[in-house]
């Protein structure tokens, strides 16, 4: 049976990938963001959902979002970045620079619900990952409220933003994405996910690490970067 990770297990799996298996952060981020773009393309084709608002947070989840935006652009989408608190580290600065050089538009103000409905077909939620602890910081309140109130479909990267990593929704107004892309392995909160599509991405887990944590990951078909759970 597929294992759902608690918060400490998710953190430890990541640490082992870095320390024991010598993956770099940017290496895993590239593979994770690429798999997110592939999952989005399977569920929301570019000819109908081409205008994508990609909301990025300050940590690794936001980095995954920056990578995802770049690959969506290469797949024929028109992503627009909302990145309210850029991380002042070379990795994130480079990812943001790559998006800029890919001619991906960036906005500095979070759009209203009405403006988002007019300008976009889909929202990518790459705000907070499995290290998130509430409450939401002031910088991110407007975009979390947009995610809670919009009628647009939402694709969440690893954890729906604002959810508890293990318990899921903390209150009734928390958003419910249409697509959840669990990375490496699903987290416990995914058991509470009621949206239409749940995908697994991040095809990089070494066999010994899978065995140690009894992840029981499904086999990815062929050369796929993601699979539907």
UniProtKB/Swiss-Prot annotation:
Binds 1 potassium ion per subunit. Pfam families: YjeF_N (PF03853). Residues 10-217 form the YjeF N-terminal domain. K(+) binds at residues 61, 125, 161. Keywords: Isomerase, Metal-binding, NAD, NADP, Nucleotide-binding, Potassium. InterPro entries: YjeF_N_dom, YjeF_N_dom_sf, YJEFN_prot_NAXE-like. Its EC number is 5.1.99.6. It comes from the Eukaryota. One of its GO terms (molecular function) is nucleotide binding. (6S)-NADPHX binds at residues 60-64, 129-135, 158. Its cofactor is K(+). Catalyzes the epimerization of the S- and R-forms of NAD(P)HX, a damaged form of NAD(P)H that is a result of enzymatic or heat-dependent hydration. This is a prerequisite for the S-specific NAD(P)H-hydrate dehydratase to allow the repair of both epimers of NAD(P)HX. Belongs to the NnrE/AIBP family. This is NAD(P)H-hydrate epimerase. It comes from Drosophila mojavensis (Fruit fly). The lineage of its organism: Eukaryota, Metazoa, Ecdysozoa, Arthropoda, Hexapoda.
């Amino acid at each position: 049976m597929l294992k759902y990770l608690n918060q400490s297990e998710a953190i430890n799996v990541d640490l082992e990938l870095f320390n024991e298996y010598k993956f770099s952060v940017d290496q895993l981020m590239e593979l994770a963001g690429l798999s997110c773009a592939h999952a989005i393309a399977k569920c929301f084709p570019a000819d109908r959902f081409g205008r994508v608002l990609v909301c990025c947070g300050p940590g690794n989840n936001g980095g995954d979002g920056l990578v995802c935006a770049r690959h969506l652009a290469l797949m024929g989408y028109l992503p627009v970045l909302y990145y309210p608190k850029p991380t002042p580290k070379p990795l994130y600065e480079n990812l943001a620079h790559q998006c800029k050089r890919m001619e991906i538009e960036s906005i500095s103000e979070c759009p209203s619900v009405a403006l988002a409905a007019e300008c976009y077909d889909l929202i990518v939620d790459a705000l907070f990952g499995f290290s998130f602890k509430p409450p939401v910081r002031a910088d991110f309140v407007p975009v979390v409220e947009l995610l809670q109130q919009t009628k647009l479909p939402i694709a969440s990267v690893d954890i729906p933003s604002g959810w508890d990593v293990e318990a899921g929704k903390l209150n009734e107004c928390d958003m419910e994405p249409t697509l959840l892309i669990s990375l490496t392995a699903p987290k416990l909160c995914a058991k509470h996910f009621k949206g239409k599509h749940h995908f697994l991405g991040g095809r990089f887990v070494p066999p010994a690490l899978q065995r140690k944590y009894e992840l029981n990951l499904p086999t990815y078909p062929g050369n796929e970067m993601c699979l539907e759970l």
